[in-house]
């Protein structure tokens, strides 16, 4: 951490989570290098626990030289239970690779391989049995991203990356949103609307490092509150990087935050009128179809009254890792869903990386929003090319994780030859290559071939995935490198001859 977080910015990031932690939750904090330290024991979150946790967070250091991932997750699993009554989650941050071997040890590779096996087969089993999620966060490229993706995948957690300490806080926040989901109200240009069903709201306002602007809140009745001047009923936590303002029984109407504009500014609420969204997992694969179901609930009961839903606009917005954005209106005032369930299939997600999916409900009397981060990962790598020695076109599908259950996984190939005939065949697993290998022979004549793969994978824990990669299209026969070189040489000779002929003709004329 000395290299990736020299200014200990993970401390204010942790403090933000401590402030956001809901009253009545159970929480604890562990740090780890070679050894694991439970610096804040698991206990019920209240004002006393929060202050103790913030004091302990200040003493977090970067002295650890090793990365005892298996030990940390094993200790943190203490007390987890399928019948705990809680939504159980771990947020794991590391900038290193699993490393339990002493420096210079000759058997370091073997020791670390054993630790990895123990982690995947024994430690994570505790989380799977308890139904607990591990949300993993890789700080910089030094972290073992493949392993952190596996941990998140095996426990239905979210995998995130923070390339530097500056982006760490918002990455922490995305993981926290998965661990402690909450309703929000939409915030546009730092303006938001609170309705009379809201019992409490918490506004998170980020500060820009170069800004000296004081954060203030303007109430619907025109009062101006700041960190220095606000009612006693308002809890205002100020940090060098953010303000967190909690207001109980807020006035209904339009509120304004006088602060820097930041896309991560947001307002979470407590209200009996809630937006419920199902079908957006934390980890997805290329080709996945997400069957999203959205309902408005009041005291847990689904709202299905036509007179309410016909006046409610429901929309969904998807933002890809590269920033591409698409939105769709799901509601039809003339024909709201009879059962109160809005259904939408998302099936064109192909870009690897982290997506942001927002669902927004707006009516004349209320507004609600739910935000989800989901990460698309690539579970297999596909390579292909012509094998000149065997005279075949070779396609290889290799799992990127050693946690793949080879016996239960399948690769199917649909091959279309130049004569337009199509065959479907299973691709065999090659033990030596540790991959599914298919060899396509030139037995249907020269021309264009097309191969569509269907990969159905299963992890050791039983988590399944299906992906349909882009079609592999190639022409056979493929010229060898020497043949290509001969053609290139002949082209040069022909070109040179043509040039001399042109010069000769010019001289004659």
Role assignments for model-derived ranges:
Residues 185-186, 267-289, 295-297, 371-391, ...:
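Short, compositionally biased P/S/T/A/G/V-rich stretches that sit at domain boundaries
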Residues 159, 163-241, 246-248, 256-260, ...:
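C-terminal "exit" segments of structured domains
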Residues 232-245, 251, 334-345, 430-439:
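Aromatic sugar-binding surface patches on proteins
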Residues 1-44, 69-77, 81, 86-94, ...:
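Von Willebrand factor
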Residues 289-302, 314, 391-401, 452-454:
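Beta-strand-rich structural segments
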Residues 59-63, 94-155, 162, 167-175:
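VWA/integrin I-like adhesion module and closely mimicked acidic/polar interface patches used
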Residues 272-274, 365-391, 463-499:
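Short beta-strand elements
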Residues 248-251, 347-354, 440-449:
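Surface-exposed, short loops/turns at beta-strand junctions within beta-sandwich domains
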């Amino acid at each position: 951490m000395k290299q990736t977080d020299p200014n200990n910015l993970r401390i204010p990031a942790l403090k933000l989570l401590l402030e956001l932690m809901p009253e009545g939750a159970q929480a604890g904090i562990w740090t780890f290098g070679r050894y694991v330290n439970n610096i804040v024991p698991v206990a019920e979150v209240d004002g006393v626990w929060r202050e103790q946790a913030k004091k302990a967070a200040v003493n977090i250091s970067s002295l650890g030289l090793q990365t005892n991932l298996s030990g940390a997750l094993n200790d943190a699993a203490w007390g987890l239970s399928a019948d705990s009554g809680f939504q159980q989650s771990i947020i794991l941050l590391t900038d290193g690779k699993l490393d339990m071997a002493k420096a210079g040890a000759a058997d370091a590779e073997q020791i670390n391989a054993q630790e990895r096996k123990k982690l995947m087969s024994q430690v994570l089993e505790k989380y799977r049995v308890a139904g607990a999620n591990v949300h993993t966060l890789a700080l910089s490229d030094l972290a073992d991203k493949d392993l952190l993706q596996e941990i998140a995948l095996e426990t239905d957690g979210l995998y995130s990356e923070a390339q530097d300490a500056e982006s760490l806080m918002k990455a922490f926040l995305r993981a926290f949103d998965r661990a402690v989901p909450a309703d929000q109200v939409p915030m546009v240009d730092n303006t938001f609307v609170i309705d009379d069903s809201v019992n409490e709201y918490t506004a998170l306002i980020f500060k820009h490092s170069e800004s000296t602007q004081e954060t203030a809140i303007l109430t619907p009745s025109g009062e101006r509150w700041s960190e220095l001047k606000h009612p006693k009923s308002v809890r205002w936590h100020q940090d060098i990087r953010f303000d967190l303002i909690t207001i109980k029984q807020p006035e209904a109407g339009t509120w304004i935050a006088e602060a820097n504009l930041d896309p991560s500014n947001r307002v979470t609420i407590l209200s009996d009128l809630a937006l419920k969204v199902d079908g957006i997992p934390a980890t997805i694969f290329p080709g996945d179809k997400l069957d999203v179901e959205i309902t408005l609930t009041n005291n847990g009961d689904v709202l299905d009254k036509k007179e309410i839903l016909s006046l409610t606009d429901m929309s969904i917005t998807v933002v890809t890792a590269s920033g591409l954005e698409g939105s769709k209106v799901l509601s039809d005032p003339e024909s709201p869903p009879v059962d109160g369930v809005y259904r939408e299939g998302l099936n064109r997600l192909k870009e690897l990386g982290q997506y942001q999916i927002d669902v927004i409900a707006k009516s004349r009397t209320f507004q609600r929003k739910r935000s989800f981060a989901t990460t698309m990962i690539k579970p297999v790598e596909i390579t292909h090319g012509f094998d000149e020695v065997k005279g075949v076109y070779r396609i290889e599908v290799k799992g990127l994780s050693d946690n793949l259950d080879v016996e239960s996984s399948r690769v199917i190939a649909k091959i279309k030859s130049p004569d337009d005939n199509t065959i479907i065949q299973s691709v065999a697993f090659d033990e030596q290559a540790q991959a599914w290998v298919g060899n396509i022979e030139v037995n249907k004549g020269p021309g264009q071939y097309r191969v569509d793969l269907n990969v159905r994978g299963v992890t050791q824990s039983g988590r399944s995935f299906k992906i349909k990669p882009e079609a592999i299209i190639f022409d056979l026969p493929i010229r060898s490198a020497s043949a290509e070189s001969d053609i290139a040489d002949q082209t040069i000779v022909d070109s040179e001859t043509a040039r001399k002929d042109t010069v000769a003709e010019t001289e004659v004329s």
